[in-house]
Amino acid sequence: MEEDTIIQKDLFAINHELKRPNNSSQIPDDLSTEELKKESQKRPRQRKNSTNLINKFKNNSNSERKNDCINEKSYSYKTVEKQKLTPILKHYVTLKEENSNRLLLYRLGDFFECFFEDAVFISNLLEITLTSKDAGKDIGKIPMAGVPYHAMERYCAELIKKNHSVVICDQLEKSTGNYGTPLKRGITRIITPGTVIEEGMLVAKKNNWITAIHLSENISENLYEWGISRADVSTGELLTMEGQSISKLFDEIIKLDTSEIIIGSNEEKKLLENQNQQITYTVTQETFFSINEACLTIKNYFQILSLEGLGLKHLNNATKALGGLLNYLEKINPSNLENDSSLKISLDFPQIQFPKDHLIIDYQTQKNLEIKNTQRENNYAGSLLWSIDRTYTCMGARCLRRWIDSPLLNIDEINKRQNIISNFLESKKLRTDTQNILRAMGDLERLSGRACAGHASPRDLIAISEGLKKLPRLKSIVKLFKYEIPSWTNQLKNIDNELLELADLISFKLVQNPPLNTSEGGIIHDGVDNVLDGLRNLIDDYSDWLNQEELKERKISKISNLKIQFHKNFGYYISINKSKVNLAPAHWIKRQTLTNEERYVTTEIKNRESKIFQVKNRAAAKEYELFCEVRNLVSAKTKRIRSVAKAIACIDALLGLAITSLENNFIKPTISPITNSTDQQSTKIIGGRNPIVEQLLTNRKFISNDILFNNKQKLIILTGPNASGKSCFIRQIGLIQILAQIGSFVPASKADIQIVDRIFTRIGAVDDQSTGQSTFMVEMSETASILNQATSNSLVLLDEIGRGTSTFDGLSIAWSVSEYLAKKIVCNTIFATHYHELNYLKHTNTNVENFQVLVKQKKDQLFFCHKIEKGGANKSYGIEAAKLAGVPKEVINKAILVLDYLEKNNQLNAQIKIK
């Protein structure tokens, strides 16, 4: 049996100790087959726990194989008699009882195993073999399934992707050869969907959020005050905020696509699940969220005396959520489990978010405008983010995604971002130089985070070093920027010399192209450490000795192709072709026979082998020690590295927006601030284009359109046939607004854009099967949300209201909603509709204007112009659209007759009068 390898502060076996071969003496292979049979008859060996199998094969018995079957009590760790289990399984059950809501992977030799119901579960989930293990003579067989330790990352990634948490129990000591004594094992890692830091488990261009929620007592029916705190453990970002109403809470949760949500009680879990059953929650100790424990946790984590400096003094709900989150992270932190205080989850100081700081885009609007994914297929390609992301680094891509999630309301910050884009557009050399720097830049945010947690590989540290070496070049670029630019650029203007010294130190100590795993050696440069150099000299000497020994044995045996080779199980051996066996000298000891090869050892080789292993093990240990010293130095600079990395990410995002602007002819919009005076509110876009559709069109030019909002034109009634471009146009307005408020240039010829506080959309609707709501009820719920939350500074985009009920009911609702938006809320609104009767609103309201999508009809053919012009349409061309869609001619002809009859007998248009 091989000696077990130890994983030191590393889940995926990148820091093994070198394995040593079993040096036990071998029995000479000099007994014939007949002699062996006689020997077995003299001393028969008894098979254990298989009496029924013996009976079956010796006596042709059909008796049941009871001991080979898994009985019902042995299926679950909860029902098995723990005291009757083997020591290893008893330990497994103890750990499983402490982690009942997580999958426990238990290291046995070269495998991580699951037992009982976990084994059945992962065998189905991962499609791996389900087998069994003897749990003791009174228990019998129990289910077992496992994965090889070297493939752990791949399988863990699959489990995490399916929203399961994993507990890793590893071996904490190496085998001593006394196989009667179980090795010491313990939990070395708890991995949850929201706390992974391994590259293979993360989406490079997305944040991986873990969110804690605290709900206070409801202040009125269904109106809870809440606090949420979310962190990306891999990048160190930490955000917290407060709010009211469950709907706003879910907007925040769903918008960020959080990977894991923790709450303090089952009551809160039940309340939230009643609102949305598609989100999974983890319930942790309720005390984590108490104000006293939360405050103490926050102070201890950030090593501060007061919360005032964090801005949390009067934010009790946010404080409780933050305390609950930090407490949870400390509980599952691997450094606590390994008693190593040098390793920890490193988070930045919390950034408090207030609604007044950002444009609010609820989940429904994100979905309707296809901001990050398409509405129908949920694909990235075809989204707004897809259309503008030209970033070179993963850091920049995540930064751009965060900006789109939370566009700015601060006009100064918007203008400063625009200024950097202008700098890039005005200088091709500036663009090219920055591209060359960023093109090979590593993900400094996550790389430094892995170093802080003790999981960075040698290649990770080299990537950090290479990234830090580029800082002086970035500094020179930032100094060339004209105009007023954001304050975060100071991180690049004032580079910490210690970071550059750290980069040089990494390059001095680590080789440029290190192996993937530390167990392979060859990480540290020669000349770095005298002890390591001395050990390497000895290794070279032993290598020379082996070469000389090979030449000597060739000469003695006269076998020219003889080789001395190494096998991890057998150690060093002499290998010869089987045809040369007759030339083997007498001092060779036969080790192994293969099909075409014979293997031997000599006393000299075996004696020297132990010394070789001793030196190699010492060298490997010294090399790992030196590597850890470098990694700890990087860990100490994690916060500083991340500060610089965030500035680099912003530069990358803005460079990408500049490239997008150049490629797609975007222009710099003029931005005006929010104002409470409707007379001063104005948005004017000339030649606006839909940034998504324009890039998807490959064989024709996109038709641009204008839009104007002012005190005389707050509500636009947009009419026109189906498939004429109404939905594309209203989405276009929302997308241009978002681009303007993230500081981007926009697809237009000219744009003067007023900042808005929220964007609301109601575009299309389907039945909500999870809540049992019909299409019409979903539509009305969305409409109610808009009417109750919109302000005069909001942008409202409506595509049909009042469908799914009778014509007169629908028209009445659409009319009333339109008038409420124009008279009561007085916000910028586009209402696309087939109710042509709404064109009459212009005559009774001074801030309503009618627009239509132009079409041309020649004989029986309909041509869509996709051009928006003043005036209301008087025909929907629904029958013509149906004809284009391929509806049978017979149905079309009948529809024409019915329409003619209805138009002649419907006096609604003539009779409609609104007081």
Curated annotation (Swiss-Prot):
UniProt KW keywords: ATP-binding, DNA damage, DNA repair, DNA-binding, Nucleotide-binding
CDD domains listed in its UniProt record: ABC_MutS1
Lineage of the organism: Bacteria, Bacillati, Cyanobacteriota, Cyanophyceae, Synechococcales
Stated name of the protein: DNA mismatch repair protein MutS
Role, per record: This protein is involved in the repair of mismatches in DNA. It is possible that it carries out the mismatch recognition step. This protein has a weak ATPase activity.
Signal peptide: none
Tree of life domain: Bacteria
Recorded family membership: Belongs to the DNA mismatch repair MutS family.
GO MF annotation: an example: ATP binding
